[in-house]
Amino acid sequence: MAMHQFKAESKKLLDLMINSIYTNREIFLRELISNASDACDKRYFKSLTDTSIGITKDDLKIHIQPDKDSRTLTITDNGIGMTKEELEKNLGTIARSGSLDFKTENQSDNIDIIGQFGVGFYSAFMVSDKVTVITKKYGEEKGVKWESTGADGYTVTECDKFKPGTDVIMHIKEDTDEEIYGSYLEIWKLKALVKKYSDYVRWPIVMDITHQEQQPTGEEDKDGKPIMHTVNVTAPETVNSMVPIWQRAKTEVTDDECVEWYKETNRDQTDPAAVLRINAEGVVSYKALLFIPGKDIDNGISGAAKKGVKLYCNGVLIMEDCDKLLHDYFEFVRGVVDSPDLSLNISREILQHNRQLKVIGQNLEKKIKAELEKMMRDDRPKYETFWKNFGIHIKCGVCDE
């Protein structure tokens, strides 16, 4: 079996990507889920013009399967799949993006493909000492198997695969004193990472979850009642929410639902003083759901206090506390902003300083100021409570300006 070399500067570049581009190992799951989501997007997009594809939107999904015995973690999708040529082109050339090629070839800004740079797949090597990819393109007779242990290169062979889609099989590293790699085989850990980074990916992310049930043994006690025993039952469970509340139409979401979502995500049982729902389209498109809290949940101002706005790109969490979005005097504002137009750096971990983010921030601040002016005019007691809680922030802002 011939060993192929990566087409970029091999070992040095791969080491750079694994050890420098990504600063947080756990994001490997976000990257692989994003790739799987892209594959499902592509198959769905093709199915709109090719009825022979024979799959509906409801059929597409992503499956996560840990196996402690074999120490593997498998991410499976039933998306478009890849041919041998596409596999070598996309995985054999570091920093090449098949998703970007697909979007360019189809010349549509309406295709919400997450991947841009083609390096996310290689984040798997941060937690794996070997990665195996088994894939089959829709319409192809045979599947293809790609395998690599890292910078030494990779092998590509034909294989049998019944259905279109892709399996990414990670052979998880052994634990060290510094890192418990085996934690990435724990159901609770994987569910937490999906919830944190990929909860709003549009396709179902499914895991086989085991829970206990009481079932009859077939015997009866002396009173004629069935004797029960506890059994473990494993069943597929969707572990992501898929459609975020801010992406749903205003007519589908009540103010009470927004308030409950705020309370749950911010662990604040006080109703927010104001809710802002924003849907902007134009040069920069974005959706935002912002809240002015009913009390100071940071307990005062502090230079170390985190900002309250989370930033998403196409439903994937990019930054938990985006301090580049709003001025410090609005750090009490909570909520989310989701935009497909953000310019990210190569690892998607850090935003590049760009005009889009500045435009979004300026527009949001105008909306917040307008809401506060409306509150001051229409509900003076509520505004006075707001001022008591956050007036010092606004005063600091006046001084800074």
Region annotations inferred by a language model:
Residues 113, 131-153, 173-401:
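GHKL/Bergerat-fold ATPase module in large chromosome/replication-associated machines
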Residues 1-187, 192, 215-217:
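GHKL (Bergerat-fold) ATPase N-terminal catalytic module, capturing the glycine-rich phosphate-binding loop
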